[in-house]
Curated annotation (Swiss-Prot):
Membrane topology designation: Peptidoglycan-anchor
Name of the featured protein: PI-type proteinase
Native source species: Lactococcus lactis subsp. cremoris
UniProt lineage: Bacteria, Bacillati, Bacillota, Bacilli, Lactobacillales
Keyword DNA-binding attributed: no
Key words, A-Z: Cell wall, Hydrolase, Peptidoglycan-anchor, Plasmid, Protease, Repeat, Secreted, Serine protease, Signal, Zymogen
Length: 1902
């Protein structure tokens, strides 16, 4: 699919790891939820017996307790399941201890109907007082003071207790239950105080009332107790407002006054609460914006920045576990709805790293639209530090990059306020305070305690300083301890020993505890230690630790007080860097200013689900701080008492949102860098500085004047520049009623000019002053009241200042009224284009040790998909580098490397990117891809990987333009090229990587052996000469060798010189095993060598051992092994309880031999010999047993010449199992594990049960617990003996054990999964593109599983399958919420099925013909046209090359169509060119068209020959012209060459003398020179004759016009007359008209007048209408409603058209009769066809007795005769005859059924069968043929003309088909008889027909 946007899509800006400052839970217990649960529990207990309740409690206690603990700890940010068992037991939890005694409300002391408040309180106090003894006992166990007490609803109190001690509490007398409580955290007011928020609350009473903030995030828990308003009466969004919106939007709902609206845009449902267990990001964000907790106890509430603001829960992250990301469509919908519903501010703490500012990005466009509607957007900057910080994601640069930005999309949005993160000043954590009771106090300081059990282990203990032999603080070696350490707290120094060794030695020395002092010399605490939990230990910073050592040294016998508790302590990170080290750097990649401002985001406390709280860090926490502050600003703007209210009310759209941002940035406080001499922190990191909410509100209330850059932005964007003097303008706006003057601060720190620098020791980025740089105003800054002033400033840099550096800083202005304005500025001195877009091979980012190979070529094996680094070589020191001359792949399918691609480390964002393959001459072979933009490479902390650009692969094929086929490219040198423009630049950069396409393997010759003496040992070498003419021999020098079948697969070769003909001499040492296998004779050698393209040569040779002249017997593999087992090479088992052992070798003559079998008997070996190679093969059968065998090899068949003797042992007895049991013999289990037990034979070495190696006891018995999963489990047990023989047994065990009934409980078919399913019209079998319906099928795991999709319950079938349909339409992203549950459990989980589809292919319209070839003589062909699609993304490829693509990150739900204008050049080849044009949409639907172009180079054709018809004087002359060659066309011009047209076949008729030009042209556009032919022999007409002809034609034209206007003639002839009149007028108007042309026009016009036909007269109209009515009646309904296939109309409709035409009278009678005849012909054909189709062959082929012909022949004759008739009335009579014949044939069919005959002779008159009367001959129609015994078929009765026929009685009636049904003329019904004469019916027919014929005849006579 194309739509793979933004790398990892949009991720939560997230919370960064807290590391050492991870916060532990704190705060008191809340009991309300637990009380209600206890009450419900009591009610439940009353419904069951005590025994049942006890058993139920026993069964569920463990599970529910663990779950409750996990839930409680999860809200605190602790994953209970990740704690070890000791930690799980030692951790403290909050509980409510409930007493056995009843509470006041239940003990009978109070009457609930009238007890007073005082009485209730009095009795409650008594209950609480009675708790004293139990509390004392509880405190003995917990060592904690009891917390809050309860006595009215519940009798109990709260306390803290370790998990392990909970059962102890339950055993205390008087305790009824111990219930785990929910825990709440204290909020941290420090963040609000940092930004002066409290001052706004107190001074201005602004808390966000009347404002709405949209939280576009992971969701909000609207039931949280802090999600409240103090007064919900005066709110911006009422329930009614929301319901109006939801009625229109068709989604979302009202929740409460604090959260008036919410919707889950990701899952398409109303579940707005984030169900993530570990942390709820959106809930934390919501709390920072607007939590409104109550009370003074910070442990029980959180107060956000705008506590009275309403919050919108716009959930854009799914609750599905399948995805942690969201996409453009979801996000855009939430942004748009935020604006529509009226949000004042929207917050997005999310993003995708290193974004851009293009409005093609749908999210950025949506933010812009929201701004334009007046909704301010606040977005986090991101948590990725710099792109140069490698894997750290902090403010460091290890690569020396000029472009380090990482601000993410949509935070790059121009109109958004983008927020960086600063550290909070304080944090709550576990801390230690050490005192001596008099003056010493160390701490509180952050520590890491080895276990919470040891909080009291250090208090009031003596301390012991451990010293080494030098008298310095020891690092904890055991030898440094003395007996004096016993019972004391030992103090040691960090270093050398592991932490657990330090603990172990201190404990061994008898110390009571251990303190480890850091060794870095700073105040940084030691908190990341791997400590055991069994010995009391913590660490101290160097500073604090040294103070403790000094004090203890001076007071060795004194005890110290040590308090360890959760404490608010200074944030150590804040002391190191006020900014959060993770906050992403700006600017945007086009040098636009970002981030905009900083807010507290490091270590922030806020809300979590279920009334919980936690600490998080990230720009995600800083962004909502600004969102809340802008809500306060908006409230100030809405305050009618504000003196500037009228001004603020004028602000609309972007003017409003820009103003809010400007005010905050103008009043922000720049942060200084405490680590680098208090210089400024770069504006690229902090924006305008730390937000000061009070200063911003002060400005709105007192002086809202602003300063912005010339472009209106509240920061100066200098972009890139090269002059040392840079001028820019600022716009000052004075919104007051008095004149203001401003002075620029001259502070040498804040207002100095800075550039970026890198600390060489740490890589940390910081700013440094530019000496000699300054900014000065061009004039005094005076701004009139209510006006603006634009002032020019000049930035001056010293001439010595190097280019390619940032220049930045802050401008601070003090107003004459005391107000202040702050404005950051930033630019790049140098050329922004110059920074490289791609790191080179082995470049600055190349770090193999760190897993980062930077830019590197990838070679892929298509069969396996395995990728290899191309050209990678390793030097002698083990360093890896890429040799760009060794990069190659092969087009040979047998090679290892089948294609090449590039993995690019992009140093910058790039636009207009193209990836090409070039040949050795630099010609483009193909374009692999084209992209509008690419994002730079960075390390993604979420996925723990670098995000590279993986460019497409090239497999060595190309598109052959000559025939349109894909072909393999020639071997040779090529280039893999990427090119693009750095964002913000305008110059294209190119980066090339050379490689070779090589399909030929290297050649190897002269394989031999050599030997050298090295260190007194003979070293053998295999030598050869090798050559590769293209890619070169393998640069890694890898080679595989075999000597006598002893292999060395990891050998390497060295170069030993070069031969005269270019071969490389190579040698590779033999391994010791190979050397031992050498013999004196023909040694078989094999050399396997590859080139760099992986083409392999496998060369075999027979080699002699150096110095050897004899040819002894050589057995391959070093001889017959000492042992033959199932793993021995050469052994092959058979099915008869044994096998065959085969070996081979060489000898100059045939070899024979013997072997001994298991019984010791000698047998002959089976041997073969190849004299050509001197090689032999021998085999011997072996038995599955253990025995000794001998093998003797002889040089003769008589076995007298022994060559070699071998002794070996056959070891083929496999190990055996006895008493092997799986699951104690049962095939079923309900447990999580089963036992596999058994005993194995004594020779067994190992037993593997599945993946587990079983332990064998002395009796060779084993027992293994094997875990099993739900369903079928195949358990394999394999025993292996010392010889490698194995025996395997297996069994399938079916388990019903399922610890999580809902895990994997639903699976879908056909590739459908939870999460995103992306497909097009052809890629998904479950989808029907014609209907847009998806049919989803699948299966559930349990019969008790329930499945709900999109709010509808899905039926589950007995076989556990299901099927349901979803209407997906043809385009869009369609999410459907899924809820999976189980009827046996009271829990469900939420998932989502999301379908992203486009089922409509794009349309492609090309201006060049795709049906017929195009011919041209221009080699530069332009393909032009347009492509459109139903979505906005299109990519274009031509001839297989990707030549254009649009911005890929689209909003597929936008409804906006896609459009691409195509204008692409193609270089043509001479001859035929097949150009393939393809357009592809976002879901890979492709439309392809071909243009065939023939190209021949331009040439000049020979001129044509022109011949006149006469050269004598004549009125006309015809000029003919012939081209000089075939295939050419001659054209002529009569206007001097201005226009040309083809010469007609008959020639050019010339009527006036003149010059005519002729030229030849061909299909390619070639032309000949034009030749002139001058006509001079045209004789002119006599002027008098010409004038007479003109006058005659003029008169005739006038007459014709009069006739046309009379209205007396039919339309056809009138139209023809009009055309003739126009033609005559044209002839008359010709300036060179001749007498002949005028006479001809006169003649044609007179003909048209003569052909005028009068319209239908009234009397004929009446007759015609009657005739048509008669025909309609004759047809009846059945026949009339049949369709004429030639017109597609029914016959009745055709007759109705005729009736309408007759009534209009626009045609003549003859025209009507002709049309009617056509209709009747069609009727006859249709009727005949119907009769024949209804007649079985046995009847149709039977003879009609009356005619002697078959019935089929009768039908055909009647049809032919009728259609041959020219008269409509005759045709009607034949129609009647066919209808009569239909009745007769039907009777014959019935008779055939009854009698079994089909000859038409079985009917009787009384049964209606008739006598089979033949069809009348054409001349007999209408004559009386006697009684036919049957009625005509439906529609057969023709109503008579009342004027001519009176044969029917007035009593007659007819049915709806015109059939007489009663009266004298009625026919008998089926089965009736009649006594009427047969001629009565025929008489009627005859009279009717005669009347019609007479009428027609009369009309003709008239």
């Amino acid at each position: 699919m194309q739509r793979k946007k933004k790398g990892l899509s949009i991720l939560l800006a997230g919370t960064v790891a807290l590391g050492a400052l991870a916060v532990l839970p704190v705060g008191e217990i809340q009991a309300k939820a637990a009380i209600s649960q206890q009450t419900k529990g009591s009610s439940l207990a009353n419904t069951v017996t005590a025994a049942t309740a006890k058993q139920a409690a026993t069964d569920t206690t463990a599970a529910t307790t663990n779950q409750a603990i996990a839930t409680q700890l999860a809200a605190k940010g602790i994953d209970y399941n990740k704690l070890n068992k000791v930690q799980q037991q030692d951790i403290y939890v909050d509980v409510i201890v409930q007493m056995s005694a009843a509470p006041a409300s239940e003990n009978g002391t109070l009457r609930t109907d009238y007890s007073s408040t005082a009485e209730i309180q009095q009795e409650t106090n008594k209950v609480i007082a009675a708790q004293a003894s139990v509390k004392a006992a509880v405190e003995q166990v917990t060592q904690q003071t009891a917390g809050e007490s309860y006595g009215y609803v519940v009798n109990g109190f709260s306390t803290k207790v370790r998990v392990v001690d909970i059962p102890k509490l339950k055993q205390i007398a008087g305790v009824k239950t111990v219930t785990l409580a929910k825990v709440y955290y204290p909020t941290d007011a420090k963040a609000n105080s940092m930004a002066n928020v409290q001052a706004v609350w107190s001074n201005y009473k602004y808390k966000g009332e009347g404002t709405v903030v949209s939280v576009i995030d992971s969701g909000i828990d609207p039931t949280h107790k802090d999600m409240r308003l103090s007064d919900d009466k005066d709110v911006k969004l009422t329930k009614s407002d929301v319901e109006k919106f939801t009625d229109t939007a068709k989604h979302g709902r009202y929740f409460n006054s604090k959260v008036p609206y919410g919707f889950n845009y990701a899952d398409n449902n109303d579940t707005i609460t984030d169900d993530t267990v570990d942390e709820q990001h959106g809930m934390h964000v919501a709390g920072i914006i607007g939590a409104n907790g109550t009370g003074d106890d910070p442990a029980k509430s959180v107060v956000g920045v705008a506590p009275e603001a309403q919050l919108l829960a716009m959930k854009v992250f799914t609750n599905s576990d399948t995805s942690a990301t969201t996409g453009s469509s979801t996000l855009v919908s939430a942004i748009e709805d935020s604006a529509k519903i009226g949000a004042d501010v929207l917050n997005m703490s999310l993003g995708s790293d290193s974004g851009n500012q293009t409005l093609e990005d749908p999210e950025l466009a949506a933010v812009q639209n929201a701004n334009e509607s007046g909704t301010a957007a606040v977005i986090s900057a991101g948590n990725s530090g710099t792109s140069g910080s490698a894997t750290e994601g902090v403010n460091k640069d290890y690569y020396g990059l000029q472009d380090n930005e990482m601000v993410g999309t949509p935070g790059t949005s121009r109109g958004a306020t983008t927020v960086a993160s600063a550290e909070n000043t304080d944090v709550i954590t576990q801390a230690v305070t050490i005192t001596d009771g008099t003056g010493l106090q160390l701490g509180p300081g952050t520590i890491q305690l080895s276990s919470n059990d040891f909080t009291g282990s250090f208090d009031q203990k003596k301390f012991y300083v451990v010293k080494d032999a030098s008298g310095n603080l020891s690092k904890g070696a055991l030898a440094d301890y003395t007996a004096d350490a016993k019972g004391k707290i030992a103090i040691v120094k960090r270093g050398e020993l592991s932490f657990d060794d330090k603990q172990k030695y201190a404990q061994a020395a008898g110390a009571a505890g251990l303190i480890i002092v850091n060794n870095d010399g700073t105040a940084t605490p030691v908190t990341s230690m791997a400590l055991t939990t069994t010995f009391p230990t913590f660490g101290l910073s160097s500073v604090t630790g040294q103070k403790l050592v000094d004090w203890v040294t001076a007071h060795p016998d004194d005890s110290l007080g040590v308090k360890i508790a959760l404490t608010l302590v200074p944030n150590q990170k804040y002391t190191e860097d006020k900014m959060s080290d993770f906050t992403s750097y700006g600017p945007v990649s086009n040098l636009s200013f970002k981030p905009d401002i900083t807010a507290p985001g490091g270590n922030i406390w806020s809300t979590q689900n279920n009334n919980g709280y936690t600490n998080m860090s990230g720009t995600s926490m800083a962004s909502p701080f600004i969102a809340g502050s802008q809500a306060l600003l908006k409230q100030a703007l809405n305050n009618k008492n504000n003196p500037f209210y009228a001004y603020y009310k004028q602000l609309k759209g972007t003017a409003l949102t820009d103003f809010l941002k400007t005010v905050e940035m103008n009043t922000a406080q720049p942060i200084n860098d405490i680590n680098y001499n208090n210089v400024i922190v770069s504006p690229r990191r902090q924006g305008a500085g730390l937000v000061d909410v009070k200063a911003a509100i002060d400005a709105l209330e007192k002086n809202p004047s602003t300063v912005v850059a010339e472009n209106g932005y509240p920061a100066v964007e200098l972009k890139d520049f090269t002059s040392t003097d840079k001028t820019f303008k600022l716009t000052f706006t004075n919104s007051t009623t008095h004149e203001l003057t401003y002075q620029m601060d001259s502070n040498t720190d804040t207002n100095a000019v800075y550039t970026s620098a890198t600390d060489p020791n740490s890589g940390v980025l910081y700013d440094k002053k530019i000496d000699g740089a300054a900014i000065k105003a061009g004039s005094n800054i005076t701004v009139p009241a209510g006006k603006t002033a634009q002032i020019e400033f000049t930035l001056s840099l010293p001439k010595s200042f190097d280019q390619q550096q940032f220049v930045e800083g802050f401008l601070n202005f003090k107003g004459s009224d005391g107000s202040r304005l702050n404005l950051p500025y930033m630019g790049f001195f140098g050329d922004w284009n110059d920074g490289k877009i791609v790191d080179s091979l082995n470049g600055i980012t190349y770090s193999p040790a760190g897993g980062n190979f930077g830019t590197v070529p990838l070679l892929t094996n298509k069969n396996t998909g395995t990728q290899y680094y191309g050209g990678m070589v390793t030097d002698a020191d083990g360093n890896q580098t890429v040799d760009d001359q060794a990069i190659a792949f092969s087009s040979d399918k047998n090679a290892l490397y089948n294609d090449i691609s590039m993995k690019y480390y992009l140093l910058r964002n790039i636009s207009n990117v193209q990836v090409d393959i070039l040949d050795g001459q630099g010609n483009k072979v193909t374009t692999l891809s084209s992209s509008t933009n690419l994002t730079k490479t960075y390390y993604n902390a979420h996925s723990q990987q670098y995000i590279y650009y993986n460019a497409p692969a090239w497999d060595g094929t190309y598109y052959d333009q000559r025939d349109g086929n894909i072909k393999t490219a020639d071997d040779g040198s090529y280039t893999y090229r990427i090119s693009g423009v750095p964002e913000g630049g305008d110059k294209r950069q190119v980066f090339d990587v050379p490689f070779k396409l090589d399909s030929k393997a290297p050649t190897v010759r002269h394989v031999a052996l050599s030997a050298k003496t090295e260190n007194g040992k003979t070293q053998y070498y295999l030598t050869a000469e090798a050559k590769d003419d293209l890619s070169g021999l393998d640069a890694t020098k890898s080679v595989k060798t075999a000597i006598n079948e002893v292999t060395n697969l990891d050998a390497t070769f060295t170069d030993a010189g070069t031969t005269a003909d270019g071969y490389t001499k190579i040698e590779t040492p033999l391994s010791d095993e190979q050397a031992q296998a050498l013999g004196n004779g023909d040694n078989s050698a094999e050399l396997y060598l590859t080139d760099n393209a992986s083409n392999a040569t496998d060369q075999d040779a027979s080699v002699q051992k150096p110095g050897s002249t004899s040819f002894d017997l050589i057995v391959n593999g070093g001889g017959i092994p000492d042992k033959i087992s199932s793993t021995t090479t050469g052994y092959e088992a058979n099915t008869q309880g044994g096998g065959t052992y085969t070996f081979s070798g060489t000898y100059p003559a045939a070899v024979d031999g013997t072997y001994t079998n298991a019984q010791g008997k000698k047998h002959d070996l089976n041997t073969t010999y190849d004299a050509a190679t001197n090689s032999f093969t021998a085999s011997m059968p072996v038995t599955n047993a253990d025995y000794a065998a001998q093998v003797d090899l002889y040089a003769d068949k008589a076995h007298t010449q022994l060559l070699k003797h071998f002794d070996t042992k056959v070891r083929l007895t496999a190990p055996t199992f006895t008493d092997l049991k799986f699951n104690n013999g049962s095939d079923q289990t309900s447990e999580a594990t089963i036992k596999v037990t058994g005993t194995v034979s004594a020779d067994t070495k190992t037993v593997n049960v599945g993946d587990t190696v079983a332990a064998l006891d002395a009796q060779h018995h084993f027992s293994v617990d094997v875990p099993v999963n739900y369903g079928d489990n195949t358990i394999k047990v394999t025993a292996t003996d010392e010889d490698g023989n194995t025996t395997t047994e297996q069994k399938t065990i079916t388990s019903s054990y399922d610890p999580d009934m809902l895990k994997n409980s639903v699976t879908f078919d056909q590739g459908v999964t939870f999460g995103a399913n992306e497909f097009n019209a052809t890629s998904a079998k479950f989808y029907d593109p014609k209907t847009g319906i998806a049919t989803i099928t699948g299966k559930v795991k349990h019969p008790t599983t329930t499945l709900q999709v999109d709010g509808k319950q899905i039926p589950i079938k007995d076989d556990l399958t299901f099927s349901f349909t979803l209407d997906l339409g043809t385009l869009g992203q369609k999410p459907f919420g899924v809820v999976v549950g189980d009827t046996t459990q009271n829990k469900t989980f939420q998932e989502a099925l999301t379908f992203i589809l486009d089922a409509v292919a794009p349309t492609l319209s090309l201006e060049s013909s795709t049906d017929a070839p195009v011919y041209t003589n221009d080699p530069n062909f332009q393909i032009t046209g347009t492509a459109t699609d139903n979505a906005q993304y299109l990519s274009l490829s031509i001839n297989g090359s990707s030549v254009a693509s649009q911005y890929v990150d689209i909003n597929i739900n936008s409804g906006k169509p896609g459009h691409m204008a195509i204008d692409q050049p193609v270089k043509l080849l001479e001859g035929k060119n097949v150009l393939t044009v393809a357009v592809t949409d976002s879901e890979d639907n492709t439309t392809t068209k071909n243009i065939t172009v023939y190209y021949e180079p331009k040439k000049t054709l020979a001129a044509p020959t022109v011949t006149p018809s006469t050269t004598e004087p004549a009125k006309t002359v015809t000029l003919t012209a012939n081209s000089a060659a075939t295939g050419e066309t001659v054209q002529y011009s009569a206007d001097g060459g201005k226009t040309y047209q083809d010469v007609p076949a008959a020639g050019v008729t010339v009527t006036a003398n003149g010059t005519f030009k002729f030229k030849s042209t061909d299909l390619y556009g070639n032309e000949s020179p034009a030749v002139d032919y001058v006509v001079t022999n045209i004789k002119a007409d006599d002027p008098a004759q010409l004038q007479a002809a003109k006058q005659e034609l003029t008169n005739l034209i006038a007459s014709a016009k009069t006739l046309s206007a009379s209205g007396k003639y039919d339309d056809a002839t009138t139209t023809a007359l009009a055309a003739a009149t126009q033609k005559a007028q044209t002839a008359l108007d010709q300036t060179n008209a001749s007498v002949d042309s005028l006479t001809g026009a006169n003649r044609d016009l007179q003909t048209a007048i003569n052909q005028l036909a009068a319209k239908l007269p009234a009397d004929k109209k009446t007759s015609l209408l009657n005739q048509l009515q008669s025909v309609k009646a004759a047809l009846g309904t059945d026949l009339g409603n049949q369709t004429d296939p030639s017109t597609g109309k029914t016959f009745t409709a055709a007759l109705d058209d005729l009736v309408a035409q007759a009534q209009a009278g626009t045609q003549t009678d003859d025209q009507h009769q002709a049309t009617l005849a056509k209709v009747l012909d069609a009727v006859l054909a249709k009727l005949a066809e119907g009769i024949k189709a209804a007649t079985p062959a046995e009847v149709g082929n039977a003879k009609d007795a009356a005619t002697g012909k078959t019935w089929y022949a009768d039908i055909a004759d009647t049809l032919t005769s009728g259609q041959a008739s020219a008269d409509a009335s005759d045709k009607l009579a034949h129609l009647q005859a066919l209808q009569s014949l239909k009745t007769k044939v039907a009777a014959a069919v019935e008779a055939a059924k009854t009698v079994g005959k089909g000859d038409g002779t079985t009917g009787t008159s009384d049964k209606g069968g008739g006598q089979g009367t033949p069809a009348p001959a054409p001349g007999d129609i209408g004559k009386d043929k006697g009684d036919e015994g049957s009625q005509p078929s439906s529609g057969g009765n023709i109503p008579t003309n009342p004027a001519t026929t009176t044969s029917t009685s007035t009593d007659d009636t007819t049915d709806r088909n015109g059939q007489l049904t009663s009266g004298k003329g009625a026919l008998p019904k089926t089965g009736e008889t009649t006594e009427r004469p047969a001629f009565g019916f025929l008489g009627v027919i005859v009279v009717i027909l005669m009347g019609v014929l007479g009428l027609k005849r009369k009309q003709r006579e008239e």
